[in-house]
């Protein structure tokens, strides 16, 4: 991966700063283990059934050029148009325009707004025709009522596209800071495990393929606050996110099971020039499960409506600079030993480990 950019001041009509940059990225996959599935069939939808005849390798390259112009037509006003061009070795060209606005409203308040088109390229497993994933049945789409199924790579996948919008207010007085931002991201071409049968293997298993699916939406509000309780000694910082929506448009299922709200608050204490301490508290809101069955297992066994209730975690750590090159760190996470165990019910999709102690040394040169 390599990148570079140059900033050029421009005096033409208004004060401007022009940014021009370029990026290049190459990803390579060589995973014999994940592509080693061998089946009795001679081929699966044109893909050799024998692992020896399928490549375990894949690669992709992305080359990009971008330009951004920070225009200040008057004091306190900034208009920032931008354009990014990406060329993907697998799927071709993509243009991503953007427009951001910042306007001061008096001495302490600023309003910001922006809109941008963005994309996400498929990963190498999703585009690798050598990668085969097999389910005996429970992981197959609900409309496949018997037998197993294969999920195969698709070299013709298009990138996921999103239109991202936000608008917010910032308030700053000396070292006090507060902000609130509304955001909405509309997605198209979401890459999903396909539910359309593209063929059957010689043994009768259904063949499916990664595909570009329907639309999705993420919408919410973010807020932050910074308060210097004792300037240069004790600072209190808080950020929070409230999710209005996070769903697949076609099913209403959440894109992922996440808290309705999350609050992080930190108390940073600079005790001496070498010694500092931090106490942190995180609150996770209620998490609701999926409501629409997508797999055979969910269809036959039914979906649990069990939600995961709100909970919080507390941690603390201490840092000590032994010298300018060496730092010591010790701490405790999840001080009150809150534990959650993953189960097959509803929103209980992950483990929350209990109390943990840690220590580390960082050397810098």
Roles of regions detected by a PLM:
Residues 24-30, 61-63, 83-89, 115-121, ...:
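Transmembrane beta-strands of outer-membrane beta-barrel pores
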């Amino acid at each position: 991966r390599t990148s570079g950019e140059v900033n050029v001041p421009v005096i033409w009509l208004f004060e401007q700063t022009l940014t021009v940059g370029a990026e290049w990225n190459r990803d390579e996959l060589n995973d014999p283990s994940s592509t080693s599935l061998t089946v009795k069939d001679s081929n699966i939808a044109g893909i050799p059934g024998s692992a020896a005849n399928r490549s375990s390798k894949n690669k992709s390259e992305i080359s990009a050029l971008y330009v951004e112009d920070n225009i200040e037509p008057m004091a306190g006003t900034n208009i920032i148009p931008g354009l990014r061009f990406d060329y993907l070795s697998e799927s071709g060209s993509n243009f991503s325009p953007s427009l951001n606005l910042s306007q001061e409203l008096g001495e302490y308040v600023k309003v910001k707004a922006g809109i941008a088109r963005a994309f996400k390229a498929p990963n190498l497993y999703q585009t690798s025709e050598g990668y085969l994933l097999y389910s005996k049945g429970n992981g197959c789409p609900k409309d496949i009522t018997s037998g197993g199924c294969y999920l195969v790579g698709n070299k013709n996948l298009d990138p996921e596209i999103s239109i991202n919008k936000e608008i917010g207010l910032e308030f700053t007085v000396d070292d006090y800071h507060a902000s609130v931002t509304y955001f909405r991201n509309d997605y198209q071409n979401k890459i999903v495990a396909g539910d359309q049968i593209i063929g059957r293997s010689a043994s009768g298993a259904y063949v499916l393929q990664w595909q570009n699916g329907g639309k999705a939406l993420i919408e919410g509000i973010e807020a932050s606050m910074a308060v210097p309780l004792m300037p240069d000694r004790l600072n209190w910082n808080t950020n929070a996110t409230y999710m209005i929506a996070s769903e697949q448009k076609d099913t209403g299922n959440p894109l992922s099971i996440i808290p309705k709200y999350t609050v992080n608050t930190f108390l940073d204490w600079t005790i001496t020039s070498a010694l500092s301490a931090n106490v942190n508290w995180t609150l996770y809101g209620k998490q609701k499960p999926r409501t629409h069955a997508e797999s055979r297992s969910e269809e036959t066994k039914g979906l649990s409506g069990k939600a995961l209730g709100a909970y919080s975690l507390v941690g603390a750590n201490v840092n000590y600079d032994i010298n300018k090159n060496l730092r010591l760190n010790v701490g405790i996470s999840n001080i009150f030993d809150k534990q959650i165990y993953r189960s097959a019910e509803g929103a209980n999709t992950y483990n929350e480990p209990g109390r943990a102690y840690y220590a580390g040394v960082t050397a810098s040169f």
